[in-house]
């Protein structure tokens, strides 16, 4: 990944499918989600400019932070992150996209048999969606919101596509649902030529992520699958308040292990709080638009393990509500790394098991005597990367689902010195979606 004048994050998720047992129905149960709140002021702008109505796109000028108003604040995303962090080696940098995973699981739920264990398990990943809108409407509105945000700031792009073997016929209802509610496409490729099919998929991914993800899938992924469900997220955000000062300093990976790293520094007003349960300081660094980076910095030099162990959705929500705008001296290392993970076992440990079994019920995916009702998920792979510098953050992620044939305010200045391992997440604040989350053990390691 090349260096950019911004904060970049990219995510790729791939799902690989196989064929299996028959079932009935193909819709996810109706649930609801509360509306997020992101307020913009309507008072006069600097210089005597006329007032601008709420929603008119003045995010670059004024930042009025209101924590996303939700009763549950997405427990699945935090359980996912916590499980990945606890199962990963301690010295590894980690980044995942919880939103990408949830989105592809919602797509699979559309194909699940009504009332089946498959459907129940998939629906349990969406329990934060509880308003008058159902799951479909939640994602339709969320993805439309992302599109509007991208038109203003060109910061966030989310794309989903189902690649199928050319002999596969997808259910028309499933295809129409994907297009209308999830802004997703279906494309048939010749999987009997896995090299050419992989090249086509990788070219699509590279184009969306501006070249950051060059190899989303390998020919072997294509060869063993009948479908590949892919989701890409590309984020390139500029800080509202850019860092003007950079310097070399020490980063303490542990008490006896330190390295030199490039740090950024600024003093300004930021939303900040502390959490005694997490034993950590929490800082919000806003980007232009509706996204912000939250940094969770443990009090103790070796406190990252306790921080991860105590990560809970309710505590994080409470901490966000407790944030106050105070003057903070921020010292943050630049960091840039990539990460990939097969999430199959992680999801199984979180209760999503049936989609990987021969008993999986996904009848809404395909039609035709050969594969109708006979597919299961073999793997869910995610690749992600992030680049944080003085201009902003660039992040990217992709999730691939392999589907195979079964038979085959204070005047005091707070100090926020990020010179030790920490946890971070990027939140889209109008919806509360956790776009990216992870842990930095060493800012100079690219994995």
UniProtKB/Swiss-Prot annotation:
Signal peptide: 1-25
A cellular-component GO term for this protein: perivitelline space
Gene Ontology annotations of biological process type: behavioral response to ethanol; defense response to fungus; defense response to insect; dorsal/ventral pattern formation; melanization defense response; melanotic encapsulation of foreign target; negative regulation melanotic encapsulation of foreign target; negative regulation of melanization defense response
UniProt main location, coarse: secreted
Compartments in which it is found: Secreted
Single GO term (MF): serine-type endopeptidase inhibitor activity
Cross-referenced InterPro entries: Serpin_CS, Serpin_dom, Serpin_fam, Serpin_sf, Serpin_sf_1, Serpin_sf_2
Keywords: Glycoprotein, Protease inhibitor, Secreted, Serine protease inhibitor, Signal
Highest taxon in the source lineage: Eukaryota
Induction conditions: In adults, up-regulated between 0 and 3 hours after bacterial infection and fungal infection. Then appears to be down-regulated in the hemolymph between 3 and 17 hours after bacterial infection.
Effects seen without this gene: Loss of maternal expression causes arrest prior to the syncytial blastoderm stage. A percentage of larvae and adults, 40% and 35% respectively, display spontaneous melanization. Melanization occurs mainly around the internal organs such as the gut and fat body, but is not associated with the barrier epithelia of the body wall. Increased melanization following wounding coupled with bacterial infection. Phenoloxidase (PO) activity is increased in the hemolymph, both in mutants that display melanization or those that do not. RNAi-mediated knockdown results in spontaneous melanization.
The keyword Transmembrane appears for this protein: no
Matches recorded under Gene3D superfamilies: Alpha-1-antitrypsin, domain 1, Antithrombin, subunit I, domain 2
Positions bearing carbohydrate: 87, 207
Reactive bond (site feature) positions: 406-407
Pfam families: Serpin
Family named by the database record: Belongs to the serpin family.
Quaternary structure note: Interacts with Sp7. Interacts with ea/easter; the two proteins are covalently linked leading to inhibition of ea catalytic activity.
Protein role: Serine protease inhibitor that functions in embryonic dorsoventral patterning and the melanization immune response. Regulates dorsoventral axis formation during early development by inhibiting the serine protease ea/easter, and is therefore important for restricting activity of the Toll signaling pathway to the ventral part of the embryo. Also plays an essential role in the melanization immune response to both physical wounding and septic infection using certain bacteria and fungi.
Designated name of the protein: Serine protease inhibitor 27A
Organism of provenance: Drosophila melanogaster (Fruit fly)
Gene name for this UniProt entry: Spn27A
């Amino acid at each position: 990944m090349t260096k950019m004048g911004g904060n970049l994050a990219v995510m790729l998720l791939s799902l690989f499918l196989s064929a299996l047992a028959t079932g009935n129905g193909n819709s996810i149960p109706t649930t609801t989600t509360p509306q997020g709140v992101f307020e913009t002021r309507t008072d006069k702008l600097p210089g005597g400019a006329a007032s601008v109505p709420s929603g008119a796109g003045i995010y670059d000028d004024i930042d009025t932070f209101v924590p996303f108003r939700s009763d549950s604040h997405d427990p699945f995303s935090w359980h996912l992150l916590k499980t990945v962090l606890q199962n990963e080696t301690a010295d590894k940098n980690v980044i995942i996209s919880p939103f990408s995973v949830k989105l592809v699981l919602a797509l699979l739920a559309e194909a699940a048999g009504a009332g089946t264990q498959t459907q129940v398990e998939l629906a349990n990943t969406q329990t934060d969606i509880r308003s008058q809108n159902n799951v479909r409407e939640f994602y339709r509105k969320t993805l439309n919101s992302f599109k509007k945000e991208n038109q203003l700031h060109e910061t966030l792009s989310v794309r989903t596509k189902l690649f199928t073997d050319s002999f596969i016929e997808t259910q028309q209802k499933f295809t129409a649902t994907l297009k209308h509610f999830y802004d997703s496409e279906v494309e048939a490729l010749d999987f009997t030529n896995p090299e050419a099919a992989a090249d086509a998929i990788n070219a699509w991914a590279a184009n969306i992520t501006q070249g950051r993800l060059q190899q989303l899938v390998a020919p072997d992924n294509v060869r063993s699958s009948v479908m590949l469900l892919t989701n890409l997220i590309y984020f390139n955000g500029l800080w509202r308040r850019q860092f003007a000062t950079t310097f070399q300093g020490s980063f303490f990976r542990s008490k006896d292990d330190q390295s030199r790293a490039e740090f950024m520094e600024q003093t300004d007003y930021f939303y900040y709080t502390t959490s005694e349960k997490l034993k950590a300081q929490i800082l919000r660094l806003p980007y232009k638009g509706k996204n912000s980076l939250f940094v969770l910095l443990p009090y103790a030099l070796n406190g990252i393990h306790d921080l991860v162990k105590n990560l809970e959705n309710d505590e994080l929500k409470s901490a966000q509500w407790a944030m106050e705008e105070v003057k903070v001296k921020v010292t943050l290392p630049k960091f840039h790394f990539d990460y990939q993970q097969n999430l199959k076992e992680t999801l199984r440990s979180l209760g999503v098991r049936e989609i990987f079994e021969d008993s999986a019920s996904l009848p809404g995916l395909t039609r035709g005597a050969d594969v109708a009702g006979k597919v299961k998920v073999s793997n869910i792979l995610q690749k992600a990367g992030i680049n944080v510098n003085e201009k902003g953050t660039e992040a990217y992620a992709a999730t691939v689902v392999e589907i195979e044939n079964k038979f085959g305010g204070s005047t005091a200045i707070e100090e926020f010195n990020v010179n030790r391992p920490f946890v971070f997440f990027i939140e889209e604040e109008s919806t509360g979606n956790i776009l990216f989350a992870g842990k930095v053990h060493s800012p100079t390691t690219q994995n």
